[in-house]
Amino acid sequence: MKLIELAARLGAELRGDAELEVTGVQGIEEAGPTEVTFVANPRYAALARTTKAAAVLVEPDFPEISAATLRIRNPYHAFSRTLGLFYQPPAYPPGVHPTAMIDPSAVIGEGAHIGAYVVIGPGVRLGMRATLLPHVVLYPGMQAGSHLFAHAHAVVREGCVLGDHVTIENGAIIGADGFGFSKNEAGQWEKIPQSGPVRLGDRVDVQANACVDRATVGQTEIGAGTKIDNLVQVGHGSRVGSDTLLCAQVGLAGSSVVGDRAILAGQAGVAGHCTLGDGVILTAQSGVSHDVPAGKMVSGSPAFDNRLWLRAVALFQRLPELAKRLDRLEKRLAASEAASDKEQA
């Protein structure tokens, strides 16, 4: 593809050789003379001057460099679109593999691809163009809209409801029993039935080995456009809003509430029954044990305001030095007081 064609498809301003052929996309340090790269983070701006890439996707006001530039707002999103032009994932034609087990009562929309050893239980309803790769299991009564894409070994449990264009990655489990137990009179833990399904909105992505547990009563809800990273745990009865990001190893205890457009960075944890407002940001490894108002960024464990946390961390790093200074001051004060006592005597 010529650069001029790529610029037209992206709606970018091209500065450089319009006839240059490009064959793919790569990171800024790895890109070669026929590949496109991007700069979205200012820390990588210097690398744009030395890159071997054919062209660099940059912001409109980016300084001139020797490589051709494609100038566009949000170069990172433009990079994503460019990847889609050059990388085509495997295609899965409609059809049912002979080893698949499909209950006669299941209703499957047109254009579905049902892979090897897929199991579809009674009463399942799938919209058009579902793709179920090998060993996917759909429990009785689950429902999904159009364009469900379930990768190998994904599981959706009984009664769960999925919207349109939902993607379930390898090993993810939607609707497993929540962690609910009560002690009986003998002091033994007894399982509490987990009767409530999971509901995923449109365009939800649940990545590899993540778990969204079913509710004790009611339902566990994930809003439209929310993305759930690998190894995330969403506890029973939790509610997550729309267009929220739950990054790797985030854990939500039961009945957590997370608003729209929130970002929970890696390994952040939220205690049960806490509410996080719209637009909240939890930085990596934050531990939240209380409600967080909309728009707040918090850090640390226990989590508190990010700006205060940064100051506290800076102070924490100085504690050994400050302890030595305090020790010296205490010794000087003690010596001064001893001398004063002698004079008074």
PLM regions and their residue ranges:
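Terminal amphipathic alpha-helical/low-complexity segments used for targeting or macromolecular assembly
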Residues: M1-T99, C160, H165, G171-A172, ...
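Structural signal for interior beta-strand "rungs" in well-ordered beta-sheet cores
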Residues: F38, G95-D305
